[in-house]
Amino acid sequence: MQSIIIRQYRFLARYLEPEFVKDPALRNANARPREKLQRLSHIQFSELLTDVADELQRRINNDPKVRFLPPVDSYHPKRNHARQKLSSLAPTRLRDLCMDVFFEVQSRYSGALKEVSSNTPPNMTRAASQPPPQVQRLPASAPKHDLYSSANASSASLHPTEQRTTSSPTIPSYANRTHTDSPTSLSHRLPNVPDTNALNTVQANNSSTSSLSQGAQTGIDSSSNYLSRIEMLESSLAKSNSLLDSSKSEMEALKAKSISDATKHKNEIFQLEEKLHEASHEAEISIKKLNDAENRIKELENNPTLSFNPELEKNLKLMQELIVAESSKTQHIVELESCIDSLKAETERWKKVAINAKSAKIDEDIRLFTMTTVPMKSIRELISPNGFLDEQLYIRYFVEMNVFVASLRRDSPSQWMSTAKDIALTLEAIVSSLREKSLLEELPDLGKKVDDLCSFTNSLMEQVRLAVINGALLPIYHVDASACSISISLMDIAKTYGLTNTGKSSLSVGRNSLHPVDDLKALSVAKTLLSEKSKQFSETNQKLLDAISSDSSSSTIQQRVHEDINVIRDTLFDVSSPLELMRDRAAYAVIHNALQEMRRYCMQLIEQEGHGENFGFTDNNSVPPLTDLAFSAAKCFKDILRAIEDAEFSVQRTQFSTR
């Protein structure tokens, strides 16, 4: 182990030689913060020294195929993860780490390094009296702020534990260090190991220092633009989260208010009914007394001898007062009955208001993912006769993006690619139509926005591909940021150039409604729609087979394949819309498997379409010939129709058994 440490120490000494010549203050070992390295055990420090030397050698080799240190089976998984994260360090951050490790080796193994000290090149101890060497200019696409932030994030996750010697080594934090490098000292690549003529090269490159200052200023301006775009995306995400929170709080408040109002009205109605019952009982008693009094009055009128009785006069006055009192009670009872009727009407009105508000809140919003909403009212306002963007594709994108982001948080990484391909297919159709419009109308600004949309899409697909390969090591918020960039760019195009109404079927809106539907009705609608799409596909598929049999040109065959793909994609989108809300999930699963089979054939047709003139002669043996794909796709329509009929029978049998 001692010989390995000495060899790695010499390697670090050769790499740090130009840095010490450029700035002699870096050689002051006592001024460097190495407290975290001093707390490491010898085994942990030797692991850190090995990892830093391997990363330095990888950057010197500059192999584009090796973007990070490959994992070693004998190492702990945490250590392999830490070795991979070393590739995210900026060159200056790696240089500082190498210096700390270099001086820590001197401090720990001072006795064993006497031989190394005698063999150290003399220009390692030479003062920095000569001007600094010329370095490569920092590219505009790599801002300094982003480099430092990624370095801090990488170094913070590599702290080992003292008990587990196989864990990853600790890399100290350099967030509070004052860098003495000039703005031009940041280089995109790690400098190669210097030779014996390094100092002569330093003097020869001194004349180009002024030109590098101007290049550094350009890099700083580009970095500021990139930071401003990041801040814009962060503000959009924050605004979207606030909109979602306000929508949720509004729905909860409306629900709580409706429940409290219903409880209050129910209690009031119950109390009024009790009062009405008591008043009715009292009214019956009063009516009975009134009838007795009237009969007594009639008897007195018929018998004149009793008319001058003073007791009778007193009783008559009491009866008249009783009649007036009972009349007022009867009037009060009538008022109570009218009040009860009004309260019942008010309760029903509030119920309708709550139901309508909830329905409007669900139907008038298209959920992007979990962060923001796009009102349907704003989409309708963007529709114009001269619009460029297809409204159906615009809504389909947001629906598929919702499915994709939900899959990110629910499914495994292996299932992310299928939902991402749906988004890519929809965006490919959008980009094709927009490019055609930009060329016909000669709109360079639209072409630039379409290029940005393509770059964001490629970035999203690359991130998903890396996440699937590496087992979701990539943070999920990176994918969310790319998805948000695509949505913002697409909404900007829609606001600038408008939408065009292509007569979208009402069945496509089924994804936007969360109301429960009848399973038989949904299956009937899907069956009707599938029959229409099957006839349309039969016509386009027959044209494709005729073009293949007549040896037509590759462009003609490619156009026929593209027509088949469009019909299949529309079928997958429209047929699945009413079926996704079915209550019988077992019946829906059978249809879903048939739809997935059709989706697979659609992807194979797209792969065939991309080969251009080499139709039927692909390098991928897993893709069947074009004619077989055409017949298989036609068979999928029959399989889906048969699955829908089986689901109808299953649903009818279930409903009959529950009656």
From Swiss-Prot:
Entry GO MF terms: MAP-kinase scaffold activity
Record bears the keyword Phosphoprotein: yes
Keywords, sorted A to Z: Coiled coil, Phosphoprotein
Modified residues (Phosphothreonine): 184
Coiled coil segments of this chain: 237-303
Cellular compartments annotated: Barrier septum; Cell tip
GO BP term, pick one: actin cytoskeleton organization
Modified residue annotations for Phosphoserine: 129, 167-168, 182, 242, 513, 555
Pfam families: GIT_SHD, VBS_C3G9
Start-end of Polar residues biased regions: 116-128, 158-187, 194-220
A Gene Ontology term for the protein's cellular component: division septum
Chain spans, region Disordered: 114-220
InterPro entries: GIT_SHD, Spa2/Sph1, VBS_C3G9
Main location: other
Keyword Transport: no
PANTHER family on file: PROTEIN SPA2-RELATED, SPA2 PROTEIN
Protein name, entry field: Uncharacterized protein C3G9.05
Species for this entry: Schizosaccharomyces pombe (strain 972 / ATCC 24843)
